[in-house]
């Protein structure tokens, strides 16, 4: 079922995109507030990272389950329930009086976000017809998703400096509750037509536990060591759980994840590229923030403002990407985006300890923003092309999970690369910490560029050129059909 009024569709898209913006923003907004949070709640240095990790861990672990629940029990229903949970968790987090309290609230936020995000994307898919109309909608979606991380750093700096760290959490409450209240008016309920209340509990337990443990192992590997007993045991248990999930799903009468969806070649390729996008880009924001604050000496607010050109460029490039997908197809657009990301990260690798924002950061920020817009929009379209409406939540959960796991894996690898290079420079006799840190960042950016280059190759090899061409032709026909009545008038 879909909304037929153009105005209703536009309002629905605004609601869904704004909600996704908040979800993405929340993964980054606390970063610049961490020093203030640490002082206020007496966090240890190791525990402070869990303000971020608790959200990332639960979000990444539950995305696939959240998407499938939306298909089975109603996309609007799960969207609203996730928003209420997310908002209440944000309120509790802002009221936190201890480190344990805040970490628990952040985990609950992650759970709410894991329900909201795939439900919102699947509602976009069921509201907008495949083709030019959906491409435009996903252009808006890509713009807000891509700019959310940069906006989170900016907004986090402003709120922390002028209102206090609590407001990086309180800001979600009115937005989330307002969105939940508007949902019944603007969104039409939809779910799998033959869905029953029978639920694959074993599949849900194994895939959620496996993904959560995998993300946990990755985000904590840099602290405890890749070869440590803790990391090896966590990865082994995650592998056992995910392997068990595959066995369970092949035998279940009503599997949580019907593996028939993986027969779609383009979907498989898009998820592989989505993993590489996460590996290349999520850590980029982390290292740029460190460079701005620890090498260039920027305040949290100034570092946040430095992201403004990047965020604005993403919005423009995502809109351009949706039009380009309609004209030439999602495959060439995605390849171009991945190449631009690789070029930008190689450019970032030229930063110096005596650098400046204009000379070292602004140029590659604009290039990576164009690449990000050109990558996010087509990879989302490719990951959902040809997917039956009743499995749209599952497809949404898959691409979101690929990007989140990729982000955790990329950050774990690149943080290890950066710290290893920094330690080597210091041990060689370099006494200037800014020089040692910068050389570590340079190495991380180069490896990230390699991830993006591999993503471009995978897009060229794994994504169907025929699907891309057919999607573009169908979108063009849809545009022509939409223009015909207005020309006749």
Where are these regions (language model features)?
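C-terminal module of multi-pass small-molecule transporters
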Residues: 74-83, 97-101, 116-120, 129-140, ...
């Amino acid at each position: 079922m879909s909304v037929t009024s153009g105005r209703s569709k536009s309002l629905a898209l605004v609601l869904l995109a704004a909600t996704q913006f908040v979800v993405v923003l929340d993964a980054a907004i606390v970063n610049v507030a961490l020093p203030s949070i640490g002082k206020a709640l007496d966090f240890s240095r190791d525990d402070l990272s869990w303000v971020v990790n608790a959200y990332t861990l639960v979000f990444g672990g539950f995305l696939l389950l959240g998407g499938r629940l939306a298909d089975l029990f109603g996309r609007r229903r799960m969207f609203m329930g996730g928003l209420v949970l997310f908002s209440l968790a944000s309120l509790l987090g802002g009221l936190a009086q201890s480190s344990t309290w805040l970490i628990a609230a952040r985990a609950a936020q992650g759970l709410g976000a894991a329900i909201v995000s795939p439900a919102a994307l699947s509602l976009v898919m069921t509201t907008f017809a495949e083709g030019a109309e959906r491409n435009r909608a996903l252009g808006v979606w890509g713009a807000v998703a891509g700019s959310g991380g940069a906006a989170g750093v900016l907004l986090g700096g402003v709120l922390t400096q002028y209102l206090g760290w609590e407001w990086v959490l309180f800001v979600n409450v009115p937005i989330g509750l307002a969105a939940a209240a508007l949902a019944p008016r603007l969104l039409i309920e939809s779910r799998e037509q033959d869905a029953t209340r029978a639920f694959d509990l074993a599949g849900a337990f194994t895939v959620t536990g496996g993904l959560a443990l995998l993300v946990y192992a990755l985000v904590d590997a840099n602290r405890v060591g890749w070869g440590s007993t803790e990391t090896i045991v966590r990865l082994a248990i995650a592998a056992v759980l995910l392997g068990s999930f595959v066995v369970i799903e092949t035998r279940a009468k009503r599997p949580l994840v019907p593996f028939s969806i993986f027969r779609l070649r383009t979907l498989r390729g898009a998820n592989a590229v989505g993993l590489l996008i996460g590996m290349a880009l999520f850590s980029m924001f982390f290292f740029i923030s460190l460079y701005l604050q620890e090498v260039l000496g920027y305040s949290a607010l100034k570092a946040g403002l430095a992201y403004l050109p990047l965020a604005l460029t993403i919005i423009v490039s995502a809109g351009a990407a949706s039009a380009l997908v309609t004209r030439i197809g999602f495959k060439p657009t995605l390849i171009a985006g991945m190449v631009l990301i690789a070029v930008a990260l190689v450019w970032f690798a030229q930063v110096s300890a005596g650098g400046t924002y204009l000379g070292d950061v602004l140029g590659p920020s604009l290039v990576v923003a164009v690449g990000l817009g050109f990558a996010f929009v087509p990879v989302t379209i490719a990951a959902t092309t040809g997917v039956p409406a009743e499995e749209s939540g599952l497809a949404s959960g898959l691409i979101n999970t690929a990007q989140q796991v990729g982000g955790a894996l990329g950050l774990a690898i690149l943080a290890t690369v950066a710290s290893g290079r920094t330690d080597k420079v210091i041990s060689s006799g370099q006494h200037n910490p800014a020089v040692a840190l910068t050389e570590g960042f340079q190495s991380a950016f180069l490896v990230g560029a390699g991830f993006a280059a591999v993503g471009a190759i995978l897009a060229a090899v794994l994504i169907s050129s025929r699907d891309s061409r057919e999607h573009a032709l169908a979108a063009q026909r849809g545009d022509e059909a939409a223009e015909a009545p207005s020309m006749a008038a």
